[in-house]
Amino acid sequence: MPAPGPTALIDAVDDRNEPLTVVPREEVFSRRANFRTVHVLVFNAVGEVLLQQLSPQRERHPGRWGSSVAGYLFAGESYVDAAHRRLSEELGVTTTVAEAGVLRMTDEGVTKFVGIFTTEADHPRNALPDHIAQLAFRSVDEVRAKLVSSPDEFTASFREVFHLVEEARGGRASAR
């Protein structure tokens, strides 16, 4: 199943994250519709987190570093199903995921609900080179330091996701 393109149908949700209607992805901001996304942080066996640098051709956040995988949920899709789908589509990875929580944040004036998961994988591959400029494993300490010294190198969503994963893991981001 391909990643949701501009005309893919996604759920517009209310302020409690309950579905209201279905809208084309490309209209979510113009309609001021709340929506859902999923982010997965992938860790390797030594505890490094996989970062994805978005392609310079991307419409939103070109060249910025973000979560290992991220994307919109298809209409009717669960967060966990979207996490598995995006791992397969973007990294060629099939694995279990652990839920870290759901984050509510504002994106261009609308609310998005971000389902956050972690997993382990040592050898992901860039399965979408037009979408992803590069992948890089980085130590959690390095990421934490870069988020302080150069926050604009990262997407706003990743900054929040990483913080939530660290909180959920007792101040130490990890897959467990």
Language model region names:
Residues 1-4, 174-176:
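Basic/polar N-terminal segments that are highly enriched at the extreme N-terminus
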Residues 2-39, 45:
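Acidic, metal-coordinating catalytic segment for phosphate/diphosphate chemistry
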Residues 37-69:
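A glycine-rich, hydrophobic loop/mini-helix early in the fold
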Residues 26, 63, 75, 104, ...:
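Nudix hydrolase/Nudix homology domain
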Residues 10, 48-49, 135-136:
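A residue-level structural signature of the nucleotidyltransferase/glycosyltransferase Rossmann-like core
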Residues 40, 69, 99, 115-117:
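A structural signal for short, well-ordered beta-strand segments
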Residues 50-51, 68-100:
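The catalytic Nudix box helix
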